[in-house]
């Protein structure tokens, strides 16, 4: 789906790249060290036996990340550079899965220089995998291996440069339950609760201004959190949520990407649902053809980039004894429907940005979602971008999202009604253009070793 995102994020620094003849001249590439322990083998991630005794958002344990937070190289993406933060933390906290069972997951807390501890952005990274070892808490670390997540650190750095504390939840939970979106939304909300409970550890205020941001798979968690907030976490006020590349309907995507370069989303999504719903697991066991079962289950061992490469162009409908199973079976359709967007109206103001040429999820479905939100009384600024597709809008839409989030953080944006615009490029938005030069300069300086964060406290 966004398999080239790391390379595309490097476009943020194109204005500076002519000065670089190789990565050796940019910052300090940390010497190789032992990779961080995989979450599947790391006792920190282990759920306690008395999990039910913890309230949602309660912190179970905490630590600094085993390895420094890192960003992918701009020219050679296999290289990684340390992100010079004031502090970083991992919190294991209690949340609730899609079946209303107690579970726990990890929150990464990133603190910039001159942080404003009363402004917190919850950033929902692209995970899109049924493998716990792909979680952002692991993938953000040095020597965790190439990933989309380390490309997204560039976006996170842009937020940190505003002085905001950024929190990044492992919203797919301890089993990698990709597409179990009630879990994802609740994990986001409980991550905010955990952040508010972490003052003695992280310095975060008890009642900070909170915003959300996510793209593609991250937009699912972001919008589900916004939908569930009034009922699941009414005390958690959200000043605004920015969501790009929204995916309102799961079954549509499963059918649309079959046989394309994004076909790897199918086994990852089906296996992710199986990790939450036993009936989906039973369907896989019964209907995946024996000669394809080992290959299908490879998705449980790989992350997004691996799945994209492994299954690119393959017709996954031919892996099962009923070609319509993956997107027409009544059980799959029912469970997928339970995890579609558009079930509750968000109270938080929304920025939704979507490519009209989105090749993963049709723009018409996001049009319908926004229309439904607005009819339910939500406040949505909706930007339809004519110049991009699903992948490229992840990059070109980021400056506008950042500018909008800054307005929400500062209480400057007082939009009270829905507004839809079809534009050539959201990158040409006045707010995006105003913020872009500083974003580019900060990103360049961060890569060459500047401490991340504003020079003065705002």
Spell out what each predicted region is:
Residues 1-29, 458:
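Fungal secretory targeting signals
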Residues 17-116, 437:
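Catalytic-loop region of hydrolases
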Residues 42, 244-343:
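Accessory cap/linker subdomain of secreted extracellular hydrolases
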Residues 97-158, 170-172:
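Short, surface-exposed "cap/lid" segments of acyl-processing enzymes
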Residues 149-155, 178-201:
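Alpha/beta-hydrolase active-site loop
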Residues 193-265:
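Primarily recognizes the serine-hydrolase "nucleophile elbow" in alpha/beta-hydrolase
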Residues 333-334, 351, 360, 367-458:
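C-terminal catalytic histidine-bearing segment of alpha/beta-hydrolase fold enzymes
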Residues 346, 351-358:
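Short beta-strand/loop motif that positions the catalytic acidic residue
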């Amino acid at each position: 789906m966004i398999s080239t995102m790391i390379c595309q994020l490097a476009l943020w620094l194109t204005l500076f790249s002519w000065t670089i003849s190789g990565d050796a001249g940019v910052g300090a590439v940390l010497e190789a060290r032992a990779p961080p322990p995989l979450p599947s083998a790391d006792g920190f991630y282990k759920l306690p036996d008395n999990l039910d005794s913890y309230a949602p958002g309660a912190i179970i344990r905490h630590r600094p990340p085993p390895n420094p937070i890192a960003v992918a190289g701009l020219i050679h993406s296999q290289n990684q550079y340390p992100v010079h933060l004031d502090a970083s933390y991992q919190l294991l906290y209690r949340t609730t899965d899609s079946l209303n069972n107690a579970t726990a997951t990890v929150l990464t807390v990133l603190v910039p220089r001159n942080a404003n501890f009363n402004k917190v952005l919850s950033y929902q990274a692209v995970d899109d995998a049924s493998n716990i070892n792909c979680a952002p808490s692991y993938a953000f670390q040095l020597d965790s291996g190439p990933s989309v997540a380390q490309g997204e650190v560039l976006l996170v750095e842009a937020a940190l440069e505003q002085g905001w504390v950024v929190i990044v939840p492992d919203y797919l939970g301890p089993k990698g339950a990709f597409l179990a979106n009630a879990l994802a939304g609740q994990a986001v909300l409980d991550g905010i609760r955990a952040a508010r409970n972490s003052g003695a550890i992280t310095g975060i205020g008890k009642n900070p201004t909170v915003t959300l941001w996510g793209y593609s798979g991250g937009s699912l968690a972001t919008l589900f959190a916004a939908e569930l907030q009034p009922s699941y976490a009414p005390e958690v006020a959200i000043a605004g949520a920015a969501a790009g590349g929204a995916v309102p309907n799961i079954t549509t995507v499963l059918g649309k990407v079959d046989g394309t370069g994004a076909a790897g989303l199918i086994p990852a999504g089906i296996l992710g649902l199986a990790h939450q719903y036993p009936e989906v697991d039973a369907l896989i066991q019964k209907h995946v053809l024996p000669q394809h079962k080992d290959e299908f289950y490879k998705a449980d061992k790989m992350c997004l980039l691996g799945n994209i490469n492994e299954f690119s162009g393959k017709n996954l409908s031919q892996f099962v004894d009923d070609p319509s199973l993956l997107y027409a079976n009544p059980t799959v359709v029912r469970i997928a429907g339970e995890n579609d967007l558009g079930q509750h109206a968000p109270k938080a103001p929304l920025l939704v940005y979507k490519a009209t040429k989105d090749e993963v999820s049709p723009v018409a479905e996001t049009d319908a979602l926004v229309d439904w939100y607005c009819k339910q009384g939500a406040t949505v600024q909706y930007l339809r971008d004519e110049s991009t597709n699903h992948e490229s809008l992840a990059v070109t839409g980021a400056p506008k999202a950042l500018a909008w989030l800054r307005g929400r953080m500062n209480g400057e944006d007082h939009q009270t009604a829905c507004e839809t615009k079809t534009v050539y490029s959201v990158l040409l938005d006045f707010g995006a253009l105003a913020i872009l030069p500083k974003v580019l300069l900060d990103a360049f300086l961060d890569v060459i070793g500047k401490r991340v964060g504003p020079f003065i406290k705002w």
